[in-house]
Amino acid sequence: LPEEYGGMGIGFMAQAYMNEILAWSPLSNRLFGVIAPNSGNQKVLLKYGSEEQKKKWLEPLIAGEMESAFSMTEPDNAGSDPRSIQTTARKEGDEWVINGHKVMTSNGIKADFAIVMCRTEEEGEDGEVNSRMTQIIVPTDTPGFNVIRSVPIWGHTGGDHVEIKYENVRVPVENQLGARGTGHAAAQDRLGAGRVFHCMNSIGQMWRAFDLMLQRTITREVHGGKLETKQLILSLIHISEPTRPV
């Protein structure tokens, strides 16, 4: 985040490295506010949000006064292809009316609002395929925002991924995030960087596991000596990290 929003103003590479360092502790990402989907939603709100939206949604999100969700993936479409989504938003007067079915919506149980990827143009309408999607901010207490169930994720506890049905969800047009048709671009802005940051988180968790393993090796007594004296154990450590002295 920029310094005016309380961030450090660091670039992409520095943030990627910080994700690796912070991931060494299981609690540091939440402590420092570098946790999905809030961090990704902050980025999108910062780039595409109006000043009113930043005041209403971004600033409380940064302050920890709100939680957010990101709602794009659908049960019948490839989650990695935002152009294939079928959830629609139709303009009626000064409102968007949203209907659709989402799954794997991250942080969906605790969220105060969700950023929802919607199809706002049909196949036969004018416009390039990447300009048919729009992201819309939906407060989770809006009538028709129906959480169906939590979706368990292997190896990931406490993430609150949920399945949601949007049934005639009405929000003001002011909740449109960015210009109409910029939803795909906004998704790529957040998902491209997010994939790298998630990878760096995994690397940080790997280093924590490796360091804990080293600690165990130099303290565990077995068969008349420490594990660090066993050739097989040393070989496994060498294979795992040949560049760091044991």
Predicted segments with their positions:
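A short, Trp-centered hydrophobic/proline-enriched beta-strand micro-motif
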Residues: 64-73, 117
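A glycine-rich, basic-preceded beta-loop-alpha segment at the flavin cofactor/substrate interface
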Residues: 14, 140-151, 159-195, 209-231
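A short core secondary-structure module
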Residues: 86, 95, 99-147
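Hydrophobic, small-residue-rich alpha-helical packing segments that form membrane-like cores
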Residues: 77-81, 91, 96
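Short Gly/Pro-enriched turn/cap motifs at secondary-structure boundaries
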Residues: 61, 76-80, 104-107, 126-128, ...
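Buried hydrophobic positions in well-ordered alpha/beta secondary-structure cores of metabolic enzymes
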Residues: 2, 18, 50, 70, ...
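Single conserved hydrophobic/aromatic residue that forms the stacking wall/gate
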Residues: 238-246
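Internal helix-loop-helix
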Residues: 1-67, 106-113
